[in-house]
Amino acid sequence: MPTPENLATDATVAIMLADGFEEVEALAVADVLYRAGVRSDLISVTDARHVTSSHGIRVVADLMLEDVDLSTYTVLFLPGGMPGTLGLKATPAIQVEALRRSDASQPIAAICAAPSILSELGILDGRQATANPAFVKAIAEGGAIVHENPVVVDEFITTSRGAGTALELGLELVRQLLGDQAAEEVSRGVVLAR
């Protein structure tokens, strides 16, 4: 994604894309981060920079997975969507990085179906979390303490429910990286009633 002209922070967010990703979840978060002055990169886990969303929208990723070191990003963000979530789950580098971040208490965010990836890795065991209603059972079976809030934060793990809560997730990431005032300014800018 183009770097905002005035970066507000050195923090960066890796937005992982597999074919079948949910475009609202990925791009709404990217948009909110951009407005706040946070650099985010759309990273393709496929064999091409063109990634097709779950609704047939083609997006050009900024980078290919093999060209980045995910550990250098402040936040690892996993959008949902089907079959995109399955594509992310099947990517060994994402599994390795999510587990590394869990062990190191470094930020991970996931929305919709993607929290199920964290659950299957054991990362949500005993943690507060949320997911798309169709995946609540899966994360509960993985030990998550499930909530229906739009966004749930448990230490360094942030989860959200779906496309309709993507702006709120983006604002929560802005709050974590830049503080309440920055999140409030972006919220007003996108005319999100809070």
Label each PLM-derived region with a short phrase.
Residues 112:
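Catalytic, metal-anchored helix/loop core of enzyme active sites in primary metabolism
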Residues 129:
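Anionic-ligand binding patches
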Residues 151:
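Conserved catalytic-core motifs of GNAT/GCN5-like acyltransferases
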Residues 1-108, 116-120, 125-126, 138-148, ...:
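Extended, subdomain-level signal for the structured scaffold at the beginning of enzyme domains
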Residues 133-136:
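Short, acidic/turn-prone active-site loops that include or flank metal/cofactor-
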